């Protein structure tokens, strides 16, 4: 699998933004991705050194619109911790460099 097929998108929430201060970044990853694949993909895409990877499966939820029900797809979330000497990952565009 290609590195860009493993890392789908960053997860942007208040909790993940707080974790960024301690060099921990949250990403949605492919459902079949392992910790080693996530580590290698992050190191390849962002040119950083990964300290640890924690992965969790988020179950799909049922949602309703009126009398119709549907299901939100399940997903797999990875929290990646970088080493202290590693550079930060730039998820947001700098306002000064536009």
Curated annotation (Swiss-Prot):
One of its GO terms (cellular component) is ribonucleoprotein complex. InterPro entries: Nucleotide-bd_a/b_plait_sf, Ribosomal_uL23-like, Ribosomal_uL23/eL15/eS24_sf. Keywords: Ribonucleoprotein, Ribosomal protein, RNA-binding, rRNA-binding. SUPFAM superfamilies: Ribosomal proteins S24e, L23 and L15e. Coiled coil: none annotated. One of its GO terms (biological process) is translation. One of its GO terms (molecular function) is structural constituent of ribosome. Belongs to the universal ribosomal protein uL23 family. One of the early assembly proteins it binds 23S rRNA. One of the proteins that surrounds the polypeptide exit tunnel on the outside of the ribosome. Forms the main docking site for trigger factor binding to the ribosome. Part of the 50S ribosomal subunit. Contacts protein L29, and trigger factor when it is bound to the ribosome. PANTHER family: 60S RIBOSOMAL PROTEIN L23A. This is Large ribosomal subunit protein uL23. It comes from Lactobacillus delbrueckii subsp. bulgaricus (strain ATCC 11842 / DSM 20081 / BCRC 10696 / JCM 1002 / NBRC 13953 / NCIMB 11778 / NCTC 12712 / WDCM 00102 / Lb 14). The gene is rplW.
